[in-house]
Curated annotation (Swiss-Prot):
GO cellular component: nucleus
Entry-linked InterPro entries: ELK_dom, HD, Homeobox_CS, Homeodomain-like_sf, KN_HD, TALE_homeobox
GO terms of molecular function: DNA binding; DNA-binding transcription factor activity, RNA polymerase II-specific
Localization in the cell: Nucleus
Gene: KNOX11
Name of the protein this chain belongs to: Homeobox protein knotted-1-like 11
Keywords tagged on the record: DNA-binding, Homeobox, Nucleus
Major site of localization recorded for this protein: nucleus
């Protein structure tokens, strides 16, 4: 009886389930950057604290060093300045 119920439910809802599954897979998981990447970005941040605006060259170098893409580098600096920078 359980098997019949399971088959009936699968038949009825398999379309919905596969749509949901693909939707979940599309949503990127939000997470922290890798620890070594964060520490490389923090090193740059700490040595440039008075003016923490990396040039495009800096961003390319940081991307190469951390394995992050330039957009991630950019977003990290935007967030970091917004959360932790008090211009003097």
């Amino acid at each position: 009886a359980d098997r019949e119920l399971k088959e009936m439910l699968l038949k009825k809802y398999s379309g919905c389930l596969s749509r949901l599954r693909s939707e979940f897979l599309k949503k990127r998981k939000k997470g922290k950057l890798p620890k070594d990447a964060r520490s490389a970005l923090m090193d740059w941040w700490n040595t440039h604290y008075r003016w923490p605006y990396p040039t495009e060259e800096d961003k390319v170098r940081l991307a190469a060093a951390t394995g992050l893409d330039p957009k991630q580098i950019n977003n990290w600096f935007i967030n970091q300045r917004k959360r932790h920078w008090k211009p003097s």
